Amino acid sequence: MYRRFYSSSSPVFWVNLRRAAPEGARRSFFTSCAWLLATFTTLAALSGCSAVPQAADPNSDAPEAAFAPRGPFIDAPTYDEALQRWQSPEDINAWIGARFRYDTDRAMQLSETQRQASGRMPILAPDAFFAAPSGVCVDVARFALETLRTLQPGVQPRYLMIEFDPVSVRGNTLRRHWLVSFERGGQHYFFADSKRPGHIAGPYASVQAFVDEYAHYRGRRIVAFSERESYERRLRTRAVAEPAS
């Protein structure tokens, strides 16, 4: 019987084990070691895949790496046929997650700076966006809203316009961001977000609750927001209530 302790990394340990243990016990021991090694290797790989995503880039409405295209979706050769196949916000959302590509150059063209210099640019119609699903936040929001109004008008889809503190990108001022809200079971949901394509946020008890959480996610202060029937309207709601006079 051995009274001295040997590390498992010590050659003496292996020699003692081979001398002391019967063949069946040795085989069981080495099998267990191999299983543990494989298990730890698998867990290490999985932990790398499920790492916490980085914080959102506050200077861009482009998708984050964590929201890369994933999951099944229903495709169609034309927009009209898609309207026949899709039934829900989830169908629209899955297609956006798989197909949408952010257009940084167009974002600069639609910036506050260039719009003041060159005038307004048209926002892509749903059929045009379906044929070439590249654009910016307001393009994907218009596509989702008008499509959802066709499929399920009862969920009351609306634009949600968010106004951030302005940032300057390539000398262009950016402050507004667009996505779509809808209601289900008395709760609020939000999707068609160019920052998180393929993601439906909710349920929330109120729009304000979502806006508060979204400001934290984006790392930017929201100074105003409004739910709108059209992207062309100019209504405004303060993000933080002013004290009573």
Language-model features, listed with the residues they occupy:
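N-terminal export leaders
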Residues: 29-30
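Secondary-structure boundary elements
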Residues: 57-132
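Active-site nucleophilic cysteine motif
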Residues: 92, 133-148
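Hydrophobic/aromatic-rich core segments of domains that either
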Residues: 142-216
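Low-complexity, Gly/Ser/Thr/Pro-rich intrinsically disordered linker/tail segments
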Residues: 216-245
